[in-house]
C-alpha cells in the first residue's frame, strides 16, 4: 500500500470519528469543513497506523482548500508565523484535553467561550471566539482581537501566579487554577491578555485549542516551506487546486493563481522572473500549468545554482552521485571537520539514497541545510574560577522599554533567562505592603516575592550554570529583613554563600544550579576600610543625578490632583527616599558576592576574593583611556569580579559597545536586553556558543576569556609583557567569507518600501577591538570602510537571491572579533545576524537570520563559505 493511500485511509477514519462525535450537531457545515486540515494534521501525528481499521473507514476525502482559499481572499493574511519565540518550545507542548481532537475544540471556540478578562482596573465578562480564516481570537464584539501568530507564550498554574498577584492581588483562590495569561506582541511591544475561565472544561478547551493552533500554524510553515521539490509541489497543489490524483491531469493553475500562491507563502520573486519560470514549465504553451508542469515550475523555482556548482566539484562527470570517499573528502577539505571515518559514515548513511550506497544531490543539499554552524564547548572548560569568564548580564532586567515611566514586568526576567542570561538585576524599594521591585522613576512596582518566584522558576531553564542576582537595595531595614526572608524561603537550598574561602572563587561547574546574591557589605563590615557611602556600591550611580530630577518632580507633584490614589502616592514616597540605605546583616549574610565602593585598586577591600566593583560605562572608559589606570583595571579583573552598566543618560535603554569592556577583562558587562541594537546583538553573539551537554542545554551564559586575559599578575607592569608574548606567538589572521545566497527571504510588511521590490544586497560589518592589519576588500561589491562592505544587488529574486561575493580582511587576532550580516532592500533592513567569528564553523554553512526584534525566522537562512588562513 502506498504512503498516500495510507494517509487517505487515516483521514477517512478521522473524518468518520469526527462525524460520529458531532452527530448531535446535525450535518457538518462549511465552517466545520474549514477546520478539517486541523483535524487531519493533529490526528496524523498521533495516530498509530492500523490498516485493517483504515480499510473499513468511509470513502470521504479531506478538503482543505476552503480554509486556504478563504484565507487567500484576505490580502494581509499569511499561513503562519514568520519567526520563533523564545518560549515557543514549552508553549506548543501544552495540551490538556485528550478526549477529543483539535478540530472539535476549535468548533467550540468558534461558537464562543464566556470568560472573565482581568486587568489592573477591572474584571469584566466577554465572549471569546476563534475566527479561523485569519487566525484570530476576538472579544468585545470583535473590537478587540489577538493574532495567533503573535503569541509568544502562554502561562498557567505556577507560571501564571506572578501575573495574578500583579494584576489582581485580591483575587479569589478559585481563580488561580483557571487563570490563563497569553503573552503576545503588537507593534514590537509585548502585551498580556489575562482571562479566567468559569469552569475547568472551558479552561482546558480554550487552552488546548490555542496551544494546538499555535503549534499547528508553526508546523505548517515548517512543513510547507521546507520539503523536497516533489513534496513541496504536491502540498501546494492540494492546497490550491485539488487533492484528487485523477484531477492532476485536467486541473490547472493560471499565472495569476501561481503568483497569488507564491505571495501567500512568502515566496517573493519579481513578476518578470516569475513569468519566465512559468513559461519554462509550461510545456503545452497554453498559459496554464497542470500538476506535472507545476512540479517542474517548483523545481525551477527552487533550483540552487550555487549548490549545483559545489555538487559538480565533487561529482565529476559522468557520475551523478556522491560516493562515500568523495563525501569524506568534502568534510575534511571543505568543511574542516575533525571527524573519523566512522562518524563521517553515520552522516553519509543518513543522507544517502534509500536503496544505494551513494548520495544524491537532494540528500547533499539537505545535508548542507542541516549542518551546525556554531562550534560546541565541552563541559571541562567550565572548571575555572568565575572571574575567568565573561558572564551574560542584564541591566534594568525588570523593564521592557525605556527607563522613565516604563511599567516594570516579570516578563523581562523570563525573557532574558530564556535566552541564557546569568546575571539579572533587582531594584528593591519600599512598598505599601513590603519590598517591591521598580525603577524609582514614578513607575508602578512588582512585589519582590513575585519576582523571586519567577527567577526560581526560570533560573535554569536554559543553562545549568550559576545565576547571579545583583541586588540594588533602596529600602528601609524592615523591608530588608522581609526581603532576606523571602529570598531564603523561595530560593532555599539553591542559595550559595562563598563564606570564608579566600584563595579563589568557585567554578561554574562547581556552582551548577546555584544562585548567588550580589549586594553591598554592611556598614560595620566596611567601616574603617572606606568612607561612608550613602548607596550600595552596586546601586546605579545614575541615581545621584536622577534623584535631583525626582525631587523636583516631587515638588511639582505635591499639589497635583493626579497623585491622589494610593498607588501614585506610593511612587511619590519612593522619590522622597532618604539618601542613605545601610545594608543589614540579614541581606549581607545570604550574599555570595559583596559589592564595595570603588576608590582605587590598591586598598585592602579591593583584594577580598568575593568582592565586586560595579561601575558605569563612563568611569570604565575613563580608566581605559588612562595608561596607568588601564593596567590596574586589567590586573584587577584577572583575579576579581567587576560589573559595568549603561550610563544614566541612556534613558531610552540604548546600549554601548561591549567589546572594549571585554577587552579590559570585565566579567559582567550588563546590557539592556530589551533593546535589540548593535550593542545587544554583540552581547548575544558573545554568548551564542552551544554547549555539549547530556541534557541538551545550550547558551550557558559563561564564556572563557581569551588566554591573554587569564594569567594572574602581582604587578601591573607585567601585563604588557603578557600581551607581547601572545603577539609574538601569533601571526595576523586572514578571514575570507564568500556570501553565496539566502533562502526564503521574507518581506517586512505590506507597507514596506520594498513591497514590490525583490532586489536585495548584503552588507557585512566586522566589529573588533583593534584596527585591521589589512582593510576589508570585496570582489563583487563596494567597500564602505576599513571594516564594512556590501555586495551588488541581486535583481528580481527575493526567494533565493544569489550574490556569490567574497569579502576578505586581515586581523591581528579573532579573540574579540564579530561579524554582522544584514540583508537590505531599498535601504530597508529585512534580516540580519551577528556572530562571534571564532564560533563560526569553517566551510559551507546555512546561518539563520533574524528580524529587527531579534527573533529567528523559521525558514530564512544565509548561505556562506568561511575560511580563516
From Swiss-Prot:
<feature type="binding site">
    <location>
        <position position="293"/>
    </location>
    <ligand>
        <name>Ca(2+)</name>
    </ligand>
</feature>
<feature type="binding site">
    <location>
        <position position="286"/>
    </location>
    <ligand>
        <name>Ca(2+)</name>
    </ligand>
</feature>
<dbReference type="InterPro" id="IPR002048">
    <property type="entry name" value="EF_hand_dom"/>
</dbReference>
<dbReference type="GO" id="GO:0000775">
    <property type="term" value="C:chromosome, centromeric region"/>
</dbReference>
<feature type="domain" description="PI-PLC Y-box">
    <location>
        <begin position="590"/>
        <end position="709"/>
    </location>
</feature>
<dbReference type="InterPro" id="IPR015359">
    <property type="entry name" value="PLC_EF-hand-like"/>
</dbReference>
<protein>
    <recommendedName>
        <fullName>1-phosphatidylinositol 4,5-bisphosphate phosphodiesterase 1</fullName>
        <ecNumber>3.1.4.11</ecNumber>
    </recommendedName>
</protein>
<feature type="binding site">
    <location>
        <position position="282"/>
    </location>
    <ligand>
        <name>Ca(2+)</name>
    </ligand>
</feature>
<dbReference type="Pfam" id="PF00387">
    <property type="entry name" value="PI-PLC-Y"/>
</dbReference>
<keyword id="KW-0106">Calcium</keyword>
<keyword id="KW-0442">Lipid degradation</keyword>
<feature type="binding site">
    <location>
        <position position="520"/>
    </location>
    <ligand>
        <name>substrate</name>
    </ligand>
</feature>
<dbReference type="InterPro" id="IPR035892">
    <property type="entry name" value="C2_domain_sf"/>
</dbReference>
<feature type="domain" description="C2">
    <location>
        <begin position="713"/>
        <end position="862"/>
    </location>
</feature>
<feature type="active site">
    <location>
        <position position="439"/>
    </location>
</feature>
<feature type="region of interest" description="Disordered">
    <location>
        <begin position="546"/>
        <end position="571"/>
    </location>
</feature>
<feature type="compositionally biased region" description="Low complexity">
    <location>
        <begin position="558"/>
        <end position="568"/>
    </location>
</feature>
<dbReference type="Pfam" id="PF00388">
    <property type="entry name" value="PI-PLC-X"/>
</dbReference>
<dbReference type="GO" id="GO:0004435">
    <property type="term" value="F:phosphatidylinositol-4,5-bisphosphate phospholipase C activity"/>
</dbReference>
<feature type="binding site">
    <location>
        <position position="643"/>
    </location>
    <ligand>
        <name>substrate</name>
    </ligand>
</feature>
<feature type="active site">
    <location>
        <position position="395"/>
    </location>
</feature>
<comment type="subunit">
    <text>Interacts with SGD1.</text>
</comment>
<keyword id="KW-0807">Transducer</keyword>
<keyword id="KW-0479">Metal-binding</keyword>
<feature type="binding site">
    <location>
        <position position="614"/>
    </location>
    <ligand>
        <name>substrate</name>
    </ligand>
</feature>
<keyword id="KW-0378">Hydrolase</keyword>
<dbReference type="GO" id="GO:0001402">
    <property type="term" value="P:signal transduction involved in filamentous growth"/>
</dbReference>
<dbReference type="InterPro" id="IPR017946">
    <property type="entry name" value="PLC-like_Pdiesterase_TIM-brl"/>
</dbReference>
<dbReference type="InterPro" id="IPR000008">
    <property type="entry name" value="C2_dom"/>
</dbReference>
<dbReference type="GO" id="GO:0048015">
    <property type="term" value="P:phosphatidylinositol-mediated signaling"/>
</dbReference>
<feature type="binding site">
    <location>
        <position position="284"/>
    </location>
    <ligand>
        <name>Ca(2+)</name>
    </ligand>
</feature>
<feature type="domain" description="EF-hand">
    <location>
        <begin position="269"/>
        <end position="304"/>
    </location>
</feature>
<dbReference type="Pfam" id="PF09279">
    <property type="entry name" value="EF-hand_like"/>
</dbReference>
<dbReference type="GO" id="GO:0009395">
    <property type="term" value="P:phospholipid catabolic process"/>
</dbReference>
<dbReference type="InterPro" id="IPR001711">
    <property type="entry name" value="PLipase_C_Pinositol-sp_Y"/>
</dbReference>
<comment type="function">
    <text>The production of the second messenger molecules diacylglycerol (DAG) and inositol 1,4,5-trisphosphate (IP3) is mediated by activated phosphatidylinositol-specific phospholipase C enzymes. Required for cell growth, osmoresistance and expression of GPD1.</text>
</comment>
<dbReference type="InterPro" id="IPR037755">
    <property type="entry name" value="Plc1_PH"/>
</dbReference>
<dbReference type="InterPro" id="IPR001192">
    <property type="entry name" value="PI-PLC_fam"/>
</dbReference>
<dbReference type="InterPro" id="IPR000909">
    <property type="entry name" value="PLipase_C_PInositol-sp_X_dom"/>
</dbReference>
<dbReference type="InterPro" id="IPR011993">
    <property type="entry name" value="PH-like_dom_sf"/>
</dbReference>
<dbReference type="GO" id="GO:0005509">
    <property type="term" value="F:calcium ion binding"/>
</dbReference>
<dbReference type="GO" id="GO:0034501">
    <property type="term" value="P:protein localization to kinetochore"/>
</dbReference>
Amino acid at each position: 500500500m502506498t504512503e498516500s493511500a495510507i494517509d487517505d485511509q487515516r483521514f477517512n477514519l478521522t473524518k468518520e470519528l469526527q462525524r460520529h462525535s458531532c452527530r448531535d450537531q446535525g450535518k457538518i457545515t462549511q465552517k466545520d469543513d474549514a477546520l478539517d486540515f486541523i483535524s487531519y494534521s493533529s490526528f496524523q501525528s498521533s495516530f498509530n497506523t492500523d490498516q485493517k481499521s483504515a480499510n473499513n473507514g468511509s470513502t470521504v476525502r479531506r478538503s482543505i482548500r476552503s480554509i486556504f482559499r478563504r484565507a487567500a481572499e484576505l490580502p494581509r493574511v499569511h499561513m503562519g508565523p514568520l519567526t520563533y519565540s523564545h518560549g515557543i518550545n514549552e508553549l506548543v507542548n501544552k495540551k490538556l484535553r485528550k478526549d477529543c481532537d483539535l478540530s472539535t475544540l476549535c468548533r467550540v471556540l468558534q461558537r464562543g467561550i464566556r470568560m472573565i478578562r482581568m486587568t489592573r482596573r477591572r474584571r469584566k465578562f466577554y465572549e471569546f471566539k476563534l475566527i479561523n480564516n485569519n487566525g484570530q481570537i476576538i472579544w468585545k464584539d470583535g473590537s478587540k482581537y489577538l493574532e495567533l501568530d503573535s503569541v509568544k507564550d502562554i502561562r498557567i498554574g505556577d507560571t501564571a501566579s506572578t501575573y495574578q498577584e500583579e494584576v489582581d492581588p485580591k483575587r479569589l483562590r478559585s481563580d488561580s487554577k483557571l487563570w490563563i495569561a497569553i503573552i503576545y506582541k503588537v507593534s514590537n511591544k509585548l502585551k498580556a491578555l489575562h482571562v479566567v475561565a468559569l469552569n475547568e472544561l472551558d479552561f482546558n478547551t480554550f487552552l488546548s485549542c490555542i496551544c494546538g493552533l499555535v503549534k499547528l500554524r508553526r508546523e505548517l510553515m515548517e512543513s510547507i516551506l521546507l520539503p523536497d521539490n516533489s513534496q513541496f509541489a504536491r502540498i501546494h497543489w492540494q492546497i490550491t487546486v485539488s487533492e484528487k490524483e485523477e484531477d492532476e491531469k485536467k486541473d490547472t493553475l493560471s499565472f495569476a493563481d501561481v503568483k497569488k500562491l507564491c505571495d501567500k507563502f512568502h515566496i517573493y520573486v519579481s513578476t518578470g522572473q516569475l513569468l519566465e519560470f512559468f513559461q519554462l514549465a509550461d510545456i503545452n504553451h497554453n498559459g496554464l500549468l497542470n500538476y506535472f508542469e507545476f512540479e517542474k515550475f517548483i523545481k525551477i523555482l527552487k533550483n540552487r545554482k550555487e549548490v549545483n556548482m559545489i555538487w559538480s566539484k565533487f561529482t565529476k562527470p559522468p557520475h551523478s552521485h556522491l560516493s562515500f570517499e568523495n563525501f569524506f573528502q568534502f568534510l575534511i577539505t571543505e568543511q574542516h571537520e575533525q571527524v573519523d571515518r566512522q562518524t563521517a559514515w553515520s552522516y553519509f548513511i543518513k543522507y544517502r539514497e534509500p536503496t544505494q550506497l551513494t548520495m544524491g544531490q537532494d540528500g547533499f543539499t539537505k545535508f548542507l541545510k542541516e549542518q551546525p554552524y556554531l562550534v560546541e564547548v565541552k563541559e571541562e572548560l567550565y572548571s575555572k574560577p568565575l572571574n575567568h569568564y565573561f558572564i551574560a548580564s542584564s541591566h534594568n532586567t525588570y523593564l521592557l522599554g525605556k527607563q522613565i515611566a516604563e511599567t516594570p514586568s516579570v516578563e523581562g526576567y523570563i525573557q532574558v533567562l530564556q535566552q541564557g542570561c546569568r546575571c539579572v538585576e533587582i531594584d528593591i524599594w519600599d512598598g505599601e505592603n513590603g519590598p517591591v521591585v521598580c525603577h524609582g522613576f514614578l513607575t508602578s512596582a512588582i512585589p519582590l516575592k513575585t519576582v523571586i518566584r519567577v527567577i526560581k522558576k526560570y533560573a535554569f531553564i536554559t543553562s545549568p550554570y550559576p545565576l547571579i542576582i545583583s541586588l540594588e537595595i533602596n529600602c528601609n531595614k524592615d523591608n530588608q529583613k522581609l526581603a532576606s526572608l523571602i529570598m531564603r524561603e523561595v530560593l532555599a537550598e539553591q542559595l550559595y554563600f562563598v563564606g570564608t574561602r579566600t584563595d579563589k572563587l568557585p567554578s561554574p561547574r562547581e556552582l551548577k544550579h546555584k544562585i548567588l546574591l550580589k549586594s553591598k557589605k554592611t556598614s560595620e563590615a566596611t567601616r574603617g576600610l572606606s568612607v561612608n557611602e550613602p548607596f550600595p556600591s552596586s546601586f546605579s550611580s545614575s541615581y545621584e543625578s536622577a534623584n535631583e530630577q525626582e525631587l523636583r518632580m516631587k515638588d511639582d507633584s505635591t499639589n497635583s490632583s493626579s497623585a491622589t490614589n494610593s498607588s501614585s502616592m506610593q511612587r511619590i514616597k519612593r522619590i522622597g527616599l532618604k539618601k542613605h540605605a545601610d545594608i543589614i546583616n540579614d541581606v549581607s549574610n545570604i550574599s555570595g558576592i559583596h559589592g564595595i565602593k570603588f576608590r582605587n585598586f590598591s586598598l585592602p577591600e579591593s583584594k577580598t576574593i568575593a568582592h565586586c566593583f560595579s561601575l558605569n560605562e563612563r568611569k570604565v572608559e575613563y580608566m581605559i583611556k588612562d595608561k596607568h589606570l588601564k593596567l590596574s583595571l586589567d590586573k584587577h579583573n584577572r583575579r576579581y569580579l567587576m560589573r559595568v552598566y549603561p550610563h544614566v543618560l541612556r534613558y531610552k535603554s540604548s546600549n554601548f559597545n561591549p567589546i572594549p569592556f571585554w577587552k579590559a577583562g570585565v566579567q559582567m558587562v550588563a546590557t539592556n536586553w530589551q533593546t535589540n541594537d548593535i550593542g545587544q546583538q554583540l552581547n548575544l553573539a558573545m554568548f551564542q556558543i552551544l554547549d555539549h551537554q547530556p541534557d541538551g542545554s545550550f547558551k550557558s551564559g559563561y564564556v572563557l576569556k581569551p588566554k591573554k586575559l587569564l594569567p594572574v599578575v602581582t604587578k601591573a607592569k607585567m601585563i604588557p609583557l603578557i600581551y607581547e608574548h601572545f603577539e609574538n606567538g601569533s601571526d595576523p589572521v586572514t578571514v575570507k567569507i564568500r556570501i553565496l545566497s539566502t533562502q526564503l527571504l521574507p518581506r517586512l510588511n505590506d507597507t514596506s518600501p520594498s513591497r514590490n521590490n525583490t532586489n536585495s544586497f548584503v552588507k557585512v560589518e566586522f566589529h573588533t577591538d583593534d584596527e585591521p592589519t589589512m582593510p576589508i576588500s570585496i570582489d563583487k561589491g563596494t567597500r564602505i570602510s576599513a571594516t564594512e562592505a556590501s555586495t551588488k544587488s541581486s535583481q528580481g529574486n527575493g526567494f533565493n537571491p544569489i550574490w556569490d561575493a567574497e569579502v576578505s580582511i586581515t586581523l591581528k587576532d579573532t579573540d574579540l572579533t564579530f561579524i554582522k550580516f544584514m540583508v537590505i532592500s531599498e535601504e530597508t533592513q529585512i534580516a540580519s545576524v551577528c556572530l562571534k567569528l571564532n564560533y563560526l564553523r569553517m566551510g559551507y554553512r546555512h546561518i539563520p537570520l533574524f528580524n529587527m526584534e531579534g527573533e529567528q525566522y523559521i525558514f530564512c537562512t544565509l548561505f556562506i563559505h568561511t575560511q580563516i588562513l
